[in-house]
Amino acid sequence: MTYLEQLEEVEHYSEAGSFRRYKEVSKDLDYIISTRHPLHVQQHLLNIPNKVKEVAVGETKVSLELEYDDETIGVDFRLVEPEAFYHTLQHFTGSKDHNIRIRQLAKAQNEKVSEYGIEQQDGTLLQFQSEAEIYQHFGRHWIAPAMREDGSEFDRDLNSIITLDDIKGDLHMHTTYSDGAFSIREMIEANIKKGYEYMVITDHSKSLKVAHGLQVERLLRQNEEIKNLNEEYTEIDIYSGTEMDILPDGSLDYEDDILSQLDYVIAAIHQSFNQSEEEIMKRLEHACRNPYVRHIAHPTGRIIERREGYQPNIEQLMQLAEETQTVMEINANPKRLDLNAATVKKYPNIKLTINTDAHHVDHLDFMKYGVATAQKGFVNKDRVINTMTRDAFKNFIN
């Protein structure tokens, strides 16, 4: 994308396809580029620095294999006239079922829709200069790409679905106290740049030695440092917390007299994934019933395409969460996305929080992936606790 931004002949560009729809795994990438100089842009694309192979080269489409993070990824670049850009973008974003519904809406108005525009009965071509105008033409509000899947999105009220702008704070992040790369102060500054109203520092607990988990003395020292920094920064509320391990025997990594001194407690499973479902559920139940535990982080422990996680009984866990008013997390790290969209859609009564689990200031940008996961699950913003205003969250904490 940085390369495309440098090309003067490119007027607009956007990712499309499954990547734009925030699918958990995209096998290849699609980009739509608007230009009045397609042959010039084509030559620039053929000179892209990380090119591995030219798959197909034409005036309106260039298919390449590019190297990224030691992997080879197929990328299709479609070159279109600026007037058709948003129609091509909508068309190639998909999904197939979503576009079938679009064509049905067009047919009902005696029109035909394509990647070039909307053809009228008399053969004239309507071309709009935003996706929103295309949807508006068919009497619909713009639908976020993450929700463009099976077509049912056309039959839902999407007015209250969460958006990235609704997020007021990040409740799960790490610092140099454990396995994070930046200090508390640096994380505060990064959260302020995000425009957040509040944040929680949640370094790992003592048993997670591989992540330099905090012994009690260091945890309390950090707690004091956070409270002092909270006095210093007036533009954001900074809360002390922990991402506390739920140990294999079901006990928690800190005693209640320690937890009571923190503002916000997260519980998580990081070890003994091979336990039985019954054993896993006993651990999660013990955490959910603890009066100081606010939410369960990455509730299945999966890492996409690397490990399945520890497979709790999801139905029992959601019932337990509802009974105990324990919040479940959508971990926004794109390698986790845990809980996933199908689960949050299936259990609409569960309160949620969307967090980045940031170990680096750049990881705060992961929030968009978590929000997209929530959108796929048609999550209304009032289900997500970190959409609360600053004062409302303070009252919730207290």
Question: How should these model regions be labeled?
Answer:
Residues 22-175, 184-195, 212-236, 248-398:
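Charged catalytic cores and adjacent phosphate/nucleic-acid-binding surfaces used
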Residues 199-203, 238-241, 297-298:
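Short beta-strand segments at enzyme active-site cores
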